[in-house]
Amino acid sequence: EEKDFSFIYIGDVQDSLGGITRQFLRKTLAHNPDASFLVCGGDLIEQPNHAYWNEAFQSMDSIRQTLPILTVTGNHDYLKGIIAELERRFSLTHSYYLDSMEGVNQVFTIRYTDMQLFCLDSNREFFHLYTQRNWLERKLEASKAKWKVVVLHHPLYSIRGKGNNL
């Protein structure tokens, strides 16, 4: 079913302790009161630890009660180590990840009216990106949505040619 709608996209927030995300989101919503949902392109937090998660939760709580928030993973949402591991609070906070993992990849798709969002995790090791690409090709082929939007943390194309992610 087609109907007009709008959504808000924010990316690479990396809010610091005592940061301005809460005020920014309130102003953004005040200027876009009819937005159907909010999409975040990752990095809700600066560091994956309790203090930063607490700040992010406080910033999002009042919004989350009235507006759905979809978030893809950013590199700051991962614990640093030999193999990057997604901070547990991320998938507990954004529970749609728990039902939509493709192997070890954090991917999901959501349809809203005649638009379908395909959300990828561009932070994974290189070999995982191939399985995500295969997942995306299958989902795009099966989608009947008029509008198809792919969301990931890193740009597909960069003005620095060597930074292209396709």
State where each predicted segment sits:
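Short, solvent-exposed loop/turn elements at domain surfaces
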Residues: 16-20, 126-129, 158-159
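Active-site metal-binding motif and surrounding structural segment of the metallo-beta-lactamase
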Residues: 29-47
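Short active-site segment of divalent metal-dependent hydrolases/proteases
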Residues: 15, 45-46, 77, 156
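Extended active-site neighborhood of metal-dependent phosphoesterases/phosphodiesterases
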Residues: 1, 50-148, 162-166
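Active-site clefts of carbohydrate-active enzymes
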Residues: 154-164
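Short, flexible loop segments at the rims of nucleotide/cofactor-binding pockets, characterized by
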Residues: 14-18, 46-49, 124
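Acidic, histidine-bearing metal-coordination/catalytic regions of metal-dependent phosphoesterases
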Residues: 1-14, 26, 30-34, 148
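Active-site neighborhood of phospho(di)ester-bond hydrolases with catalytic His/Asp-centered motifs
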Residues: 9-11, 37-43, 68-75, 120-121, ...
